[in-house]
């Protein structure tokens, strides 16, 4: 831009080029406020690796954590790309589903790096043309001014105040078919023919949707009534493992192991030990399986058996006897009296599919403080007995958990859909 000035002393006119100050910002995709696990979404939360309002980071191994995210550099800022996973809404894909037929509504967050003004910049969402028929984003562009109309939110991150502006439920993303590989949605700021990337989202590939088969076994040891919650199968389908594009299917619901009034010494001794809480968890599972077979049933290797009963069980944990809601042993599950709820069932199925507690140390898996994340496999209490800040809203699975689930040997990747209504009719 050329500007002309008149010098007062001489009246001489002078021309000079004015350089416009570069406006810098980043745009992040984020989950909607009322998210309950309807689709997979994972991102590098600030609290994982930064000091938030004087609270120390909750991830103990940030160097491992970083390896699980794609990292970009925009405006000399480290940018962690979030992940989105949607079940393909397609009748042509044999694993197509109507669960995510409405797509995912996401928030957009603008992070200010410099002071901003309405300069006519447009924000465009770009998808490779090869995937334009399969991945749909609405709208395809917005004006920067839309952000500037929103109030500024200030967050103190690592002792620095960061300004954000949020457009809630601003974009909708749908997957309408098979993605043979992960697909990026790039966020491009455009003005006067110039482009600058300021954000990105990666859509998880949909070419493999494995299946896990669950067999429920009700173990009756007394006359007190008990049952599993009515909503847990819905949650398996709509609020949990769908995030990992994994089909967890209960194929048998009416299996019963009734141990009441049995005279066999094996049964009598086991019930005495069970009810007096004098038995280790491996022995509980061993006895349930042996008695299940003894009374005419079979144990199939590639199925997950979930035994549930109404006895309290206590286990030794770091020198302390604690009541346990449930546990997984050698790929099968036992749910005890205190665990007959949807969250515990999902937590234990996660273990059966190979997931580890995020607060226990394993090679190449990020380590977190106990009871600090919104992850299904975390605990509702911290190491110090205080409540997890996300209790009641622990609906997420990490992206690396999606990957780990797909490595589980009990899953089937090639199968004929003998239960075609699984995804669509409950």
Can you annotate each of these PLM segments?
Residues 200-232:
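Low-complexity, Pro/Ser/Thr- and charge-rich linker/hinge segments at domain boundaries
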Residues 2-209:
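Beta-strand-enriched, solvent-exposed domains that form extended recognition/catalytic surfaces
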Residues 210-213, 242-244, 302, 372-373:
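Residues that flank catalytic or metal-binding motifs in active/ligand-binding sites
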Residues 333-426:
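The catalytic-center signature of Zn2+-dependent metalloproteases
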Residues 217-221, 251-253, 307-312, 337-339, ...:
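Active-site-proximal beta-strand/loop segments in catalytic clefts of secreted hydrolases
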Residues 228-249:
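A short alpha-helix/helix-coil micro-patch that ends at or immediately precedes a cysteine
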Residues 103-114, 185, 214, 299-311, ...:
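Short, hydrophobic/proline-enriched secondary-structure or compact coil segments at domain edges
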């Amino acid at each position: 831009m050329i500007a002309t000035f008149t010098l007062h002393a001489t009246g001489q006119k002078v021309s000079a080029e004015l350089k416009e100050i570069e406006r810098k910002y980043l745009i992040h995709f984020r989950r909607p406020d009322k998210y309950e696990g309807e689709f997979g979404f994972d991102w590098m939360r600030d609290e994982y690796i930064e000091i938030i309002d004087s609270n120390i980071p909750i991830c103990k191994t940030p160097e491992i954590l970083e390896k699980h995210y794609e990292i970009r550099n925009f405006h000399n800022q480290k940018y962690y790309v979030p992940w989105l996973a949607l079940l393909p809404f397609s009748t042509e894909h044999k694993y197509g589903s109507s669960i995510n037929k409405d797509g995912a509504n996401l928030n957009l967050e603008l992070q200010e790096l410099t002071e901003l003004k309405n300069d006519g910049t447009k924000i465009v969402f770009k998808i490779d043309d090869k995937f334009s028929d399969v991945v749909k984003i609405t709208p395809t562009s917005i004006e920067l001014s839309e952000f500037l109309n929103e109030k500024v939110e200030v967050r103190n991150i690592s002792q620095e105040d960061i300004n954000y502006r949020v457009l809630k439920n601003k974009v909708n993303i749908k997957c309408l078919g098979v993605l043979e590989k992960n697909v990026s949605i790039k966020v491009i700021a455009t003005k006067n023919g110039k482009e600058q990337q300021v954000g990105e989202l990666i859509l998880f590939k949909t070419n493999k949707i494995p299946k896990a088969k669950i067999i429920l076994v009700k173990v009756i040891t007394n006359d007190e009534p008990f049952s599993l919650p009515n909503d847990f199968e819905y949650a398996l389908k709509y609020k949990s493992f769908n995030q990992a594009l994994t089909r967890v299917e209960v194929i048998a619901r009416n299996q019963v192991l009734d141990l009441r009034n049995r005279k066999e010494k094996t049964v009598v001794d086991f019930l005495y030990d069970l009810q007096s809480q004098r038995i280790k968890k491996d022995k509980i599972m061993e006895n349930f399986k042996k008695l299940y077979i003894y009374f005419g049933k079979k144990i199939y290797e590639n199925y997950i058996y979930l035994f549930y009963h109404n006895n309290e069980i206590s286990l030794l944990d770091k020198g302390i006897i604690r009541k346990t809601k449930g546990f997984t042993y050698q790929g099968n599950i036992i749910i005890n009296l205190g665990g007959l709820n949807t969250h515990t069932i999902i937590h234990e199925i996660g273990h059966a599919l190979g997931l580890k507690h995020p607060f226990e140390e394993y090679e190449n898996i990020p380590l977190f403080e106990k009871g600090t994340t919104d992850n299904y496999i975390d605990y509702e209490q911290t190491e110090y007995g205080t409540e997890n800040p996300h209790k009641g809203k622990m609906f997420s699975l990490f992206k690396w958990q999606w990957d780990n689930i797909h490595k589980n040997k009990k899953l089937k990747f090639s199968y004929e859909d003998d239960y075609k209504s699984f995804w669509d009719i409950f």
